[in-house]
């Protein structure tokens, strides 16, 4: 197959949802339809507690939330699909944000009993920044749901995106009978398939087919016809251009738990979602059809293999083809490296990649030299942009139970901060270590991982820090004066960038007024 054909068949997407809308279940079922795992949700761990194949860190298994982004590749129709799983828990916005910079489309999962929830709103704001195309799956139709028309109205008014229903539900809860496909004029009858059983679906052609009345009952069939008249009059038709521009979302109904409807949106994804897209770099735009290799690191994951203390850098291939043993330029440090052991991911199973194309995600073994946002090329000096670091909103001082382990603590914290799990600040005025996070859960994750991965027992104490800003100043003399007078409030972050840690917002505002030549940044490009 030629290079352009390989690129054209790639689809790289992420699933976004509010916690508990059923994202992990959908991830499993998607893999099931892609034949990537045999028994969804029953991948047995030690002991017999079952856990999904994509939730693979210890704490995730205990809490049932996906904390780290996993990558899964599977074939579907004539495409090769890369699914990036994003943390569903509300705390992990940074990691999720960075993952969304590496995909070309998203599937938004909505719990049809609840409708649009706040986390969904936040994630949609992020996809807006790059006008990412969105597909929507209304999940949990085997339960009692809200009125489907109401759900569409809510998505349109709250998320400011037009809805084009592709399938329409027939009943819900105990009366859920299936869905009607508006563009194929077919009804798919629902039979619950649990676990890894994908039921043969009975298809009834045509809306006026008497078999439909016989199968779902005359009342529901009549209700369906009336609803569809309303839907076709009141809602948008699917429009490929508006979808690609992020202005319209095709909507599918189903139940992931009952293995029903998942294949409908996968058909939509492979048919309509964009192939790997061009990306902005600091000097030019890089097209996916270019034959020279380029890629950027959007995430670093420590200790994916508990047996080896390794760290893997996840890289999105933007253009060209990776081949085992090729020489690439690590642009930030200006060094050429030979990459012979890149990984690909089949749902948590790591295999060595012989090759990878634009749109694929590969894993690079990282011994501390790779950072989030790093660009790799075949020699060209360019840096992909748009992978931000956010100023944390919560701070704690971290302290050791055993003071002799200071070195391990620092090493662990720096590694975790490079990975983007947390940010670490070392004040210039004392030997404290301050940890900054976007959400409370991140603090628990750090202590748990320090213990299991670095054998360090640490505890938190409150610290008088309200917020942090990265500081820069073009005037060297004024900057020196600023540093001299504010040493008490200055720290270095994990990447040795100078940071102002403010005890109160008032203090920050006063400092900004007092030093107009110093710029205080809330986000920083990686």
Swiss-Prot record:
Superkingdom of source? Bacteria
> GO molecular function terms here?
GTP binding; GTPase activity; guanosine tetraphosphate binding; translation release factor activity, codon nonspecific; translation release factor activity, codon specific
* Cellular localisation: Cytoplasm
Q: Where is the tr-type G domain?
A: 8-277
Keywords assigned by UniProt?
Cytoplasm, GTP-binding, Nucleotide-binding, Protein biosynthesis
Main location per UniProt?
cytoplasm
Question: Where does it sit, as one GO cellular component term?
Answer: cytosol
Among CDD domains, the record links this protein to:
RF3 (cd04169), RF3_II (cd03689), RF3_III (cd16259)
Which residues are GTP-binding?
A: 17-24, 85-89, 139-142
Q: Which InterPro entries match?
A: EF-G-like_DII (IPR053905), EFG_III/V (IPR035647), G_TR_CS (IPR031157), P-loop_NTPase (IPR027417), PrfC (IPR004548), RF3_C (IPR032090), RF3_dom_3_sf (IPR038467), RF3_GTP-bd (IPR041732)
Report disulfide bridges, numbered on this chain.
none
GO BP annotations of the record are: regulation of translational termination
User: Is the keyword Mitochondrion in the record?
Assistant: no
Q: Does the keyword Ribonucleoprotein apply?
A: no
The task this protein performs is described as:
Increases the formation of ribosomal termination complexes and stimulates activities of RF-1 and RF-2. It binds guanine nucleotides and has strong preference for UGA stop codons. It may interact directly with the ribosome. The stimulation of RF-1 and RF-2 is significantly reduced by GTP and GDP, but not by GMP.
HAMAP family referenced in this protein's UniProt entry, alphabetically: Rel_fac_3 (MF_00072)
Family label? Belongs to the TRAFAC class translation factor GTPase superfamily. Classic translation factor GTPase family. PrfC subfamily.
Q: What is this protein called?
A: Peptide chain release factor 3
Name the source organism: Actinobacillus succinogenes (strain ATCC 55618 / DSM 22257 / CCUG 43843 / 130Z)
User: What is this protein's gene name?
Assistant: prfC
């Amino acid at each position: 197959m030629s290079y352009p054909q390989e690129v054209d068949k790639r689809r790289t997407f992420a699933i976004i949802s509010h916690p508990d809308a059923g994202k992990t279940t959908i991830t499993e079922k998607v893999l099931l339809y892609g034949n990537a795992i045999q028994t969804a949700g029953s991948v047995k761990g030690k002991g017999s507690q079952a856990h999904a194949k994509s939730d693979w860190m210890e704490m995730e298994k205990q809490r049932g939330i996906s904390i780290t982004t996993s990558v899964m590749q599977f074939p579907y129709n004539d495409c090769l699909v890369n699914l990036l799983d994003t943390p569903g828990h509300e705390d992990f916005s940074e990691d999720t944000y960075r993952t969304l910079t590496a995909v070309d489309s998203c599937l938004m999962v909505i719990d049809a009993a609840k409708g649009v929830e706040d986390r969904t709103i936040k994630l949609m704001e992020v996809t807006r920044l790059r006008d990412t195309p969105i597909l929507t799956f209304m999940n949990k139709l085997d339960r009692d749901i809200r009125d489907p028309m109401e759900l569409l109205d809510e998505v349109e008014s709250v998320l400011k995106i037009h809805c084009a229903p592709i399938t329409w539900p027939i009943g819900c809860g105990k009366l859920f009978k299936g869905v009607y496909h508006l563009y194929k004029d077919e009804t798919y009858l629902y039979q619950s398939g649990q676990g890894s059983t994908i039921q043969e679906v009975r298809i009834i052609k045509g809306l006026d087919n008497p078999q439909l009345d016989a199968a779902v009952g005359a009342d529901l069939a009549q209700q369906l016809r009336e609803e569809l008249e309303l839907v076709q009059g009141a809602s948008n038709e699917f429009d490929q251009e508006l979808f690609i521009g992020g202005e319209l979302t095709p909507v599918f109904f189903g139940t992931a738990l009952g293995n029903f409807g998942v294949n409908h949106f996968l058909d939509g994804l492979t048919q309509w979602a964009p192939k790997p897209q061009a990306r902005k770099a600091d000097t030019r735009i890089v097209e996916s059809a270019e034959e020279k290799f380029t890629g950027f690191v959007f995430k670093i994951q420590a200790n994916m293999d508990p047996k080896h203390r390794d760290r893997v850098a996840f890289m999105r291939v933007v253009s060209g083809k990776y081949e085992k043993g090729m020489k690439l330029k690590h642009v930030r440090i200006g060094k050429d490296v030979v990459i012979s052991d890149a990984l690909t991911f089949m749902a948590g199973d790591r295999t060595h990649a012989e090759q990878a194309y634009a749109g694929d995600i590969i894993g690079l073994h990282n011994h501390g030299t790779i950072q989030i946002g790093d660009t790799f090329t075949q020699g060209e000096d360019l840096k992909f942009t748009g992978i931000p670091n956010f100023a944390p909103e919560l701070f704690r001082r971290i302290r050791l139970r055993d003071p002799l382990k200071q070195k391990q603590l620092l090493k662990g914290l720096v590694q975790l901060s490079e990975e983007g799990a947390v940010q670490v600040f070392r004040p210039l005025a004392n030997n404290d270590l301050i940890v900054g996070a976007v959400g409370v859960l991140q603090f628990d994750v750090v202590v748990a991982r320090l213990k299991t991965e670095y054998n360090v027992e640490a505890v938190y104490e409150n610290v008088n820090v309200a917020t942090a800003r990265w500081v820069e100043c073009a005037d060297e003399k004024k900057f020196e004066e600023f540093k001299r007078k504010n040493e008490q409030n200055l720290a270095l972050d994990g990447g040795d960038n100078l940071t102002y840690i403010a005890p109160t917002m008032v203090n920050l505002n006063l400092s900004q007024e007092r030093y107009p030549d110093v710029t205080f940044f809330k986000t920083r490009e990686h």
